[in-house]
Structure formats: structure tokens, C-alpha cells
Amino acid sequence: MTYQDKVKCSTKASKMGGSQIWFKENEELTVDEALKAICVVSANDVTVAMAEKIGGSEENFVKMMNDKAKELGMENTCFKNSHGIDEEGHYTTAKDIAIMSRELITKHPDILKYTSIWQDTLRNGT
């Protein structure tokens, strides 16, 4: 996947609650724009769309998340969704988040480009 690949909004993603950018069904963002929306705005709608792009479905992506958590030694984590909104059985610890964060920053240092943004625009300046 490249930063210029497209992430398309599904019906499910467009109906997400919580923090969002009002991603409309069939609207597309580049991966670059999607990462910005996820990291800066905590956009749950875009998070679901990205999960669907990577995993084929959010459910499969969550399985991938849990498999990776086990591989990393995150012993007190169980993901139930991709966006982090409270759900029965969805939990983690500060220690496990630290393990995940170390892996993310070590293997994908470009993420710091997004997580250090305080305020920015998407969709041609909006």
C-alpha cells in the first residue's frame, strides 16, 4: 500500500459514531489523508474504512490486530473493533499500548509525521 492509494468509504464506515470527519459513502481519501484523519481527528469513520481496506472487513482486521498483539507479547489486550470505542470485552493496558507504540514507531517512523500534527486540513482545504 502506498500513501497515494485510495481508501473508499463503505456504508458501515459512513455510519460510525464518535469522533469523525463525516466520511460519506463511496467518498475516497488517499492513504496519506486517511492517516492524517485517523491520527489528528481520531476519525472513527476513516479508521473503519482503512481497516476494511487492509483486512477486507473490519472483523478480519480486528483478528489481525489481535494476532499481532499476541505476537508482540501484549498479554492483557483484546480488541473487539478497529476504532477503540468501548465495547464489551475490548480492553488493554498502558504496558501493552507501550509495547504496540514501540513497534509502531520503530517499524513505521513516518507515523510521527502524522501524530505531531496539531491542526491541518483535508479535502482541498476543509
Task: Identify the meaning behind each predicted range.
Residues 5, 24-28, 36-40, 55-59, ...:
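Short gly/ser-rich anion-binding loops that grip negatively charged ligand groups
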